[in-house]
C-alpha cells in the first residue's frame, strides 16, 4: 500500500490508529514535504456540493441467489452496532450504490437494532421479507478487530444456501438469505439506479500535523519502554497524532525514517532563512528535539522533551523551539560549545533500554543525558557538534584561563596556532610554551589540578607541569576541543564539508593576547 517518490518526500500507507481509550481503527497516512495527514474513511454525498453523511436510508430486495448480497459483523457484545463487512458483486446491495462496507445498521424496517446482539440482527434480517429498508450510518472508526476490507472490491460469492449459526467476528452472510416465500427473479441489470443523491466512500482528513519543529517518539512518554511497531508524532503546538500502529517492524522503521528525513529537510531550510539575519559568528549549525533524562530517579517521568540548538559559540537547551530573537535570550540553559564535552554512548554505557543516547558534560562537570529516536539522528547530532566546535575554535583561535602555580597567579593560553603558553599574570612574562604535539599525557584530580606531561624537543625528556584551576572541567574540555579541531584539520573530507563555513568564520574579527618574552 505504500510508495515513495523519487525524492522520498511523500509516502502513503494504511496503519492502525489508537486515539485515547478507543479501539484501534484503520487510517491512511499520507506524508508530504511539510505535513503528515491522517485520514479516515467516510461516506459523502458527491452530487452537487459534497457533504458528509449522517444517517441514510437504503431499500434493497432479496434475490433468489445471493439474497441481499451482503455480510455483517459486530454487535452489542462488542459495544458496537452490527456493520456491513462484505458486499457481493452484482448483487442487490452493490447495485443500489447506497450501501458501503463499514456502514453500521441502525434500523431494519423501522426496528431499532443499534444495541442488538449479532445473532438478533441476523434473525431480523432473515425474517425481513422480500424487501428490506435499512437505516445506516458509516462507522468511521470501526475497531480493527473486525478486519473490515477498505473497499468494496472483496470476494463475497453469492449463495442460496443458509446457515443456522453466526459469529459476531465472522462474516454472517450465507444464512441471511433464507426466506420461504422468496420468488424474486429480477435480473441484476433491471435494478433501478438511485435517483437524486449519489454517495461515495472517500478518505477524509482526520488530523493534519505540520512537520516543522514537530517531534516523534516510539517510547511511552517519559519512559524507556518502546512501543512495538508503533509511534506518535507531536506538532510544535502540542497536537498529537495518537498512537500509530504499523503492520510490521520494517514498515515502522520506513515511516520513522521518512518522517525524520522530511523534518530534517524542513529544519535545514528554516536554519538557512534564520541565518540570513545573524552575523557570521552567530550562525545556527543545528536545531532539533531530543529527550533529556531527569537526574532525580524518583521522578514519575524519567525523560522529558528538550529542544537543542547549536548557534555560534553556544549550545542552547530550550523547552520549545525558539521562534523570535527574544526567544534565544530565554533558553533554559546555555553552554559554551568549546567548554563542554559530548560523548556518544556505547551499549555498555547506557543507563536503560533507550539505545540512541549521548551525554554532554558541562563546564561545571554536570553530566546531562539525552536520547534520540534513530541512529541517523544520533549521527546528525554528532556531526553538528563537531562542526560547531571546529568553527568556534577556528574563530576564537585562543583561550586564556587564570591558574595558580606554586601560589603565584598565572595564566594558561591555549592557542590554536602555537599550542600551550604559561605566563605570569602580573608581568605577562612567559614561563614556558609547548606545541600540541609535545603533550604526551595529562592527569587531573577531578577537582582543580591538572598535571601536563610535555616532551622537551631537545632532550626528549618528559617535563611535568602542574597547574591549579578554579574551573577545571572548562579547561579540560577546551583543551579537548582544540585538539579535536587540530585533528579535523587533517581530515580532507571534513575540511571539504566545512569550506564555506570556515571561510566565513575566518573573516570574523578575532582578538589574541599579547605576550612579552
Curated annotation (Swiss-Prot):
Domain called PH: residue spans: 283-390
Keyword line: Actin-binding, Cytoplasm, Cytoskeleton, Nucleus
Top-level taxon of origin: Eukaryota
Ranges of residues in domain PDZ: 57-140
Organ and tissue specificity: Brain specific. In CNS, it is expressed in the perikaryon and proximal portion of the neuronal processes. Strong expression in the hippocampus, neuron-rich dendate granule cells, and pyramidal cell layers. Highly expressed in neurons of the cerebral cortex. Also expressed in the cerebellar cortex, deep cerebellar nuclei, thalamus, and basal ganglia. No expression in muscle cells.
Any single Pfam family the record assigns to this protein: PDZ
One GO CC term on file: nucleus
GO molecular function: actin binding; structural molecule activity
UniProt subcellular location: Cytoplasm, Cytoskeleton; Nucleus
Gene Ontology BP terms: cell communication
Keyword Cytoplasm among record annotations: yes
Keyword Cytoplasm found: yes
Subunit structure: Isoform 1, but not isoform 2, interacts with the dystrophin protein DMD and related proteins DTNA and DTNB. Interacts with DGKZ.
Family: Belongs to the syntrophin family.
PANTHER family: GAMMA-1-SYNTROPHIN (PTHR10554:SF2), SYNTROPHIN (PTHR10554)
Domain remark from Swiss-Prot or TrEMBL: The PDZ domain binds to the last three or four amino acids of DGKZ. The association with dystrophin or related proteins probably leaves the PDZ domain available to recruit proteins to the membrane.
Its biological purpose: Adapter protein that binds to and probably organizes the subcellular localization of a variety of proteins. May link various receptors to the actin cytoskeleton and the dystrophin glycoprotein complex. May participate in regulating the subcellular location of diacylglycerol kinase-zeta to ensure that diacylglycerol is rapidly inactivated following receptor activation.
Protein name listed in UniProt: Gamma-1-syntrophin
Protein species of origin: Homo sapiens
Amino acid at each position: 500500500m505504500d510508495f515513495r517518490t523519487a525524492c522520498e518526500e511523500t509516502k502513503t500507507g494504511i496503519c492502525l490508529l489508537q486515539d485515547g481509550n478507543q479501539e484501534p481503527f484503520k487510517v491512511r497516512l499520507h506524508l508530504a514535504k511539510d505535513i503528515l495527514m491522517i485520514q479516515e474513511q467516510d461516506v459523502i454525498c458527491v452530487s452537487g456540493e459534497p457533504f458528509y453523511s449522517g444517517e441514510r436510508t437504503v431499500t434493497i430486495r432479496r434475490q433468489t441467489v445471493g439474497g441481499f448480497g451482503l455480510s455483517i459483523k459486530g454487535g452489542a457484545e462488542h459495544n458496537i452496532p452490527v456493520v456491513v463487512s462484505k458486499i457481493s458483486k452484482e448483487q442487490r446491495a452493490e447495485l443500489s450504490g447506497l450501501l458501503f462496507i463499514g456502514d453500521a445498521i441502525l434500523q431494519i424496517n423501522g426496528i431499532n437494532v443499534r444495541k442488538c446482539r449479532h445473532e438478533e440482527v441476523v434473525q431480523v434480517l432473515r425474517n425481513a421479507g422480500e424487501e428490506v429498508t435499512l437505516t445506516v450510518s458509516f462507522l468511521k472508526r470501526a475497531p480493527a478487530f473486525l478486519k473490515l476490507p477498505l473497499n468494496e472490491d472483496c470476494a463475497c460469492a453469492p449463495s442460496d444456501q443458509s446457515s443456522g449459526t453466526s459469529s459476531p467476528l465472522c462474516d454472517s452472510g450465507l444464512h441471511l438469505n433464507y426466506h420461504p416465500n422468496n420468488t424474486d427473479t429480477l435480473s441484476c441489470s433491471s435494478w433501478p439506479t438511485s435517483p437524486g443523491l449519489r454517495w461515495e466512500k472517500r478518505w477524509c482528513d482526520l488530523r493534519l500535523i505540520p512537520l516543522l519543529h514537530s517531534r516523534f517518539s516510539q517510547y511511552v512518554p517519559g519512559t524507556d519502554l518502546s512501543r512495538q511497531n508503533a509511534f506518535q508524532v507531536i506538532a510544535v503546538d502540542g497536537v498529537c497524532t495518537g498512537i500509530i500502529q504499523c503492520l510490521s517492524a520494517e514498515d515502522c522503521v520506513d515511516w520513522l525514517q521518512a518522517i525524520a528525513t522530511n523534518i530534517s529537510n524542513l529544519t535545514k531550510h528554516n536554519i538557512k532563512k534564520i541565518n540570513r539575519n545573524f552575523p557570521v559568528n552567530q550562525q545556527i549549525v543545528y536545531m532539533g528535539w531530543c529527550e533529556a533524562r531527569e537526574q532525580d530517579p524518583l521522578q514519575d517521568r524519567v525523560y522529558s522533551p528538550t529542544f537543542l540548538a547549536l548557534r555560534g559559540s553556544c549550545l542552547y537547551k530550550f523547552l520549545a523551539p525558539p521562534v523570535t530573537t527574544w526567544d534565544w535570550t530565554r533558553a533554559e540553559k546555555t553552554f559554551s560549545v568549546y567548554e563542554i564535552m559530548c560523548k556518544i554512548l556505547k551499549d555498555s554505557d547506557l543507563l536503560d533500554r533507550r539505545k540512541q543516547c549521548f551525554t554532554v558534560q558541562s563546564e561545571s562537570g554536570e553530566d546531562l543525558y539525552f536520547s534520540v529516536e534513530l541512529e541517523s539522528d544520533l549521527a546528525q547530532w554528532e556531526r553538528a557538534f563537531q562542526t560547531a566546535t571546529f568553527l568556534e575554535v577556528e574563530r576564537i583561535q585562543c583561550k586564556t584561563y587564570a591558574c595558580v602555580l606554586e601560589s603565584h597567579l598565572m595564566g594558561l593560553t591555549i592557542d590554536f596556532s602555537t599550542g600551550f603558553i604559561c605566563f605570569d599574570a602580573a608581568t605577562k612574562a612567559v614561563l614556558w610554551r609547548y606545541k600540541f604535539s609535545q603533550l604526551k599525557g595529562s592527569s587531573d584530580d577531578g577537582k582543580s589540578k591538572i598535571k601536563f606531561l610535555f616532551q622537551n624537543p631537545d632532550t626528549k625528556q618528559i617535563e611535568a607541569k602542574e597547574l591549579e584551576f578554579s574551573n577545571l572541567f572548562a579547561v579540560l574540555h577546551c583543551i579537548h576541543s582544540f585538539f579535536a579541531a587540530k585533528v579535523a584539520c587533517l581530515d580532507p573530507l571534513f575540511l571539504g564539508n566545512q569550506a564555506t563555513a570556515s571561510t566565513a568564520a575566518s573573516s570574523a574579527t578575532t582578538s589574541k593576547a599579547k605576550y612579552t618574552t
